[in-house]
Amino acid sequence: MNDTVLILIRHGETLWNTQLRMQGSLDSDLTPEGESQIKALGEWMKEVPFDYLYCSDTTRAHKTAEAIRKFTGHNLNLDKRLREKNLGIFEGLTSEEARERYPETFQQFKTAGASYVIDQGESTQQLLERSLDAIEEIMDLHPHKVTVVVTHGGVVRVLMKYVLGIPLDSPTQFLISNTGIFRLVWREKWIVAEMGGVPHLEKVNNYSV
């Protein structure tokens, strides 16, 4: 019997990524580099056997998933539970701008932990709960299949911490590159088979890890 496999992929590079702006539930356009990344990803995924394709309903994730669908022909399923963390009043700002505009709130945001709910936004714990809700539903729908999920850095981070048993409040970080690939295999528990690989970017100009 085949394993149940989940392939998490972060979206391509956006303008706000390059400006270090907090995107959250908002969107910004893919950069020319991001467009190159998703094209390379799509071509690469053409050679990767998988059964189902899901993505966040944000434009950056949708465009990235569409680049895969273009080469593979899979139906695309959008799920708003796979969105990036809602960063509320900080969305669209750099960390420096947020610190200057909301000094007390920004300090709380940085120190209060995973249960802290940003004004007009959500907590990291809430992000994990809705992301897990989506992933568990996908796995129940498609047991013993390979499912690709195009999502966001924050979603990948909390899911990987959950899988690895790392507390959400831990400062542990992972390199989650744009279009980075994380492969999980279910064998009574999640096994990490790939951690942020970007083999498809070897031919993209100026790319370096």
Where do the model's predicted regions map?
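Short active-site segment of divalent metal-dependent hydrolases/proteases
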Residues: 14, 155-156
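Short beta-strand scaffold positions
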Residues: 55-56, 129, 150-151
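Active-site-proximal alpha-helix that buttresses catalytic centers in soluble enzyme cores
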Residues: 13-74, 78, 122
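Phosphate-handling substructures
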Residues: 29, 70-130, 185, 191-195, ...
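Active-site signature of alpha/beta-hydrolase-fold catalytic machinery across serine-
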Residues: 67, 158-162
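Acidic, low-complexity terminal tails and accessory targeting/binding regions
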Residues: 1-5, 88-99, 140-145, 161-209
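Short, conserved phosphate/pyrophosphate- and ester-handling motifs at nucleotide-, phospho-/glycolipid
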Residues: 11, 152
